[in-house]
Design a protein with these regions (language model features):
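Short, charged/polar "capping" segments at the starts of alpha-helices
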Residues: 10-15, 42-46, 67-71
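The C-terminal output helix
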Residues: 94-102
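Output/docking surface of receiver
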Residues: 66, 73-94
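Structural motif
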Residues: 4-10, 36-42, 62-65, 83-85
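Proline-centered loop/turn at the N-terminus of a beta-strand
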Residues: 56-60
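Short, charged N-terminal beta->alpha structural module
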Residues: 1-25
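Conserved phosphotransfer microenvironments
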Residues: 30-55, 65-66
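Short, structured coil segments at secondary-structure junctions
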Residues: 18, 55, 74-77
Length: 102
């Protein structure tokens, strides 16, 4: 599964079977099944999603508080995770894979 992040996340948090690429490393990430964004990267994601993502993809937003959720809900984000719970990122990836990508 290809995951592209638009924000800095410790790659050691991800299961080894996931191919994780940070968008800013090359600026040329493609074929994302899942994209991970935060409040600071939402507009960059919107500008680049057609060239970065597969036709069918899932977006996961990392939120810090309720105001982040309010900002994201108008962008059609598929799933959310609190930044305090980021160590559980694999659980949400597996969940969205089963429910939205299968």
């Amino acid at each position: 599964m290809n995951i592209v992040t638009f924000c800095q996340i410790d790659e050691s948090l991800f299961n080894p079977e996931f191919k994780v690429e940070y968008f800013h490393t090359t600026g040329e990430a493609t074929d994302a099944d899942i994209v991970i964004i935060d409040i600071d990267s939402i507009f960059e994601f919107e500008e680049n999603k057609t060239k970065v993502c597969k036709e069918k993809f899932v977006s996961i937003a990392i939120i810090d508080d309720e105001s982040d959720y309010e900002a994201f809900k108008n962008f059609g984000i598929d799933a959310w995770i609190r930044s305090a719970d980021i160590s559980q990122i694999n659980n949400i990836i597996n969940l969205v894979n089963k429910r939205l990508l299968s």
